[in-house]
A protein has these predicted regions:
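Alpha-helical transmembrane segments in multi-pass integral membrane proteins
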Residues: 1-12, 18-42, 58-72, 135-136, ...
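Alpha-helical transmembrane segments and their helix-entry boundary regions
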Residues: 9-12, 73-74, 82, 147, ...
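Residues within membrane-spanning alpha-helices of integral membrane proteins
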Residues: 13, 17-20, 53, 84-90, ...
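Divalent metal-coordination and catalytic microenvironments
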Residues: 16, 24, 47, 54, ...
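Helical transmembrane-bundle signal
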Residues: 20-23, 50-56, 90-93, 123, ...
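Generic alpha-helical transmembrane segments of integral inner-membrane proteins
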Residues: 21, 87, 91-95, 99, ...
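Juxtamembrane transmembrane-helix termini
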Residues: 46-80, 85-110, 209-213, 265-268
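Membrane-interface helix-loop-helix regions
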Residues: 83-150, 184, 255-261, 265-266
């Protein structure tokens, strides 16, 4: 079972790589053949990441967190995985803000948004502490780092739930369902914008926790055609998704992503999607 599960992780890593590529193209906003509806809505792949993270983190740590010191060690590992690049990018943006200020001071040239208007001392401190997506009312500095802030504290909440539930799956599942439902309700009445990123992360991450527990509890196999259907449905819904400020179908995407991942995990042998995703060039991606 363990070896089989580890084999499954390989194609999930490939999915992570493909999603990362789509997100990167979305942020670079490059033209040509890459400028299409799939990449224009590539921001939704972040939610795919969150679902995957919920599954993978549960797979690796659900049975390992037995004390508060285990949570601390878990958070330290997450910290050193997320923080180094975040702090490097933060100081790069600090250099940019200082350059804008000096150019204004010396040459009288000002940018559309003057230096340190939003990227100021207060938001710099919240970014240093990874609190920015939880407490700031807008995105600042390296705006894409909102997901890092959200993930870090979602991981911490996950650790607390595992610890205080004594790893009892029924309690974990009930709490996960409550978090998913409350997050869904909140987002439905607001939006999927990054300023609500923490709630968005909770929603998708704990869906990932739920599909891990489901796949780990029920060993039956389902037809491969379900994974093909959910794969096509995921792509189609991303293509026709609404802008971030409009809820529309966007709020249902994490549910479809979860169904797709679960259908892969519980699929029968000779699944062509798994065969493709286990090719080395995709794993290395």
């Amino acid at each position: 079972m363990q070896n089989h599960a580890k084999q499954k992780i390989l194609y999930l890593e490939s999915l992570r790589g493909v999603a990362a590529l789509i997100v990167a193209i979305f942020h670079f906003d490059i033209g040509s053949i890459f400028n299409n509806e799939l990449t224009k809505n590539g921001w939704l792949m972040v939610d795919f990441f969150f679902v995957l993270s919920g599954f993978v983190i549960s797979f690796n740590y659900l049975d390992k967190i037995k004390s508060f010191s285990d949570i601390v060690q878990f958070q330290i590992k997450r910290f050193f995985r997320l923080y180094p690049l975040h702090i490097i990018m933060l100081f790069i943006f600090l250099v940019i803000e200082c350059s804008k200020y000096l150019v204004k001071l010396k040459f009288g040239l000002s940018s559309t948004i003057p230096a340190f208007t939003y990227n100021n001392l207060n938001t710099f401190i919240t970014n240093i502490l990874l609190l920015h997506n939880l407490v700031d009312n807008r995105l600042t500095w390296n705006v894409q780092s909102w997901s890092i802030s959200s993930e870090f504290f979602t991981y911490f909440l996950f650790g607390l739930i595992i610890l205080f539930s004594a790893r009892k799956k029924l309690i974990i599942n009930i709490l996960s369902i409550v978090i998913v439902l409350l997050s869904f309700y909140f987002l439905q009445n607001h939006s999927m914008e990054p300023k609500y990123g923490f709630i968005r992360c909770l929603y998708s991450f704990f869906l990932g926790v739920l599909i891990f527990n489901f796949s780990n509890s029920f060993k039956f196999k389902i037809t491969n055609y379900l994974s093909y259907i959910f794969f096509i449905l995921s792509i189609l819904l991303v293509i026709i998704a609404e802008p971030e400020k409009i809820i529309g179908i966007n709020i249902f995407l994490p549910l479809i992503f979860s169904a797709f991942i679960l259908s892969l995990i519980m699929s029968q042998n000779k699944n062509y999607l798994i065969y493709l995703l286990e090719r080395k060039f995709l794993i290395y991606l």
